[in-house]
């Protein structure tokens, strides 16, 4: 026989008006914050990934794939030049 942990049952929480008042604001705000994070370009700057227009340059039209594990830094420097 299981004992009580003293916590409110999940069904009580989900059917609570207070729960929905709080979450009807916070859940959409999370989506808006994520959209702003990506649309402003901050995500590209934070994680260091190239923007979609930076994958291919005028001089380099091939896919920048690192093929040699031990000369990876040299290959990445070639891709950036």
From Swiss-Prot:
A single GO BP: photosynthetic electron transport chain
UniProt KW Heme keyword: yes
Location(s) in or outside the cell: Cellular thylakoid membrane
GO CC terms, sorted: photosystem II reaction center; plasma membrane-derived thylakoid membrane
Cofactor: record remark: With its partner (PsbF) binds heme. PSII binds additional chlorophylls, carotenoids and specific lipids.
Gene3D superfamilies for the chain: Photosystem II cytochrome b559, alpha subunit
Regions crossing the membrane: 21-35
Key words of the record: Electron transport, Heme, Iron, Membrane, Metal-binding, Photosynthesis, Photosystem II, Thylakoid, Transmembrane, Transmembrane helix, Transport
Membrane disposition: Single-pass membrane protein
Needed co-factor(s): heme b
One Pfam family this sequence matches: Cytochrom_B559a
Binding site residues for heme: 23
GO MF: electron transfer activity; heme binding; iron ion binding
Keyword Electron transport: yes
Function description: This b-type cytochrome is tightly associated with the reaction center of photosystem II (PSII). PSII is a light-driven water:plastoquinone oxidoreductase that uses light energy to abstract electrons from H(2)O, generating O(2) and a proton gradient subsequently used for ATP formation. It consists of a core antenna complex that captures photons, and an electron transfer chain that converts photonic excitation into a charge separation.
Quaternary assembly: Heterodimer of an alpha subunit and a beta subunit. PSII is composed of 1 copy each of membrane proteins PsbA, PsbB, PsbC, PsbD, PsbE, PsbF, PsbH, PsbI, PsbJ, PsbK, PsbL, PsbM, PsbT, PsbX, PsbY, PsbZ, Psb30/Ycf12, peripheral proteins PsbO, CyanoQ (PsbQ), PsbU, PsbV and a large number of cofactors. It forms dimeric complexes.
Family: Belongs to the PsbE/PsbF family.
Protein name: Cytochrome b559 subunit alpha
Organism: Picosynechococcus sp. (strain ATCC 27264 / PCC 7002 / PR-6) (Agmenellum quadruplicatum)
């Amino acid at each position: 026989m299981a004992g009580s942990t003293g916590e409110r049952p999940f069904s009580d929480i989900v059917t609570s008006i207070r729960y929905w008042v709080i979450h009807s604001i916070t859940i959409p705000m999370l989506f808006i914050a994520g959209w702003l994070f990506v649309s402003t370009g901050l995500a590209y700057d934070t994680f260091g990934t190239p923007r979609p227009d930076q994958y291919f340059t005028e001089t380099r039209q091939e896919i920048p794939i690192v093929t040699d594990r031990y000369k990876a830094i040299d290959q990445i420097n070639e891709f950036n030049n």
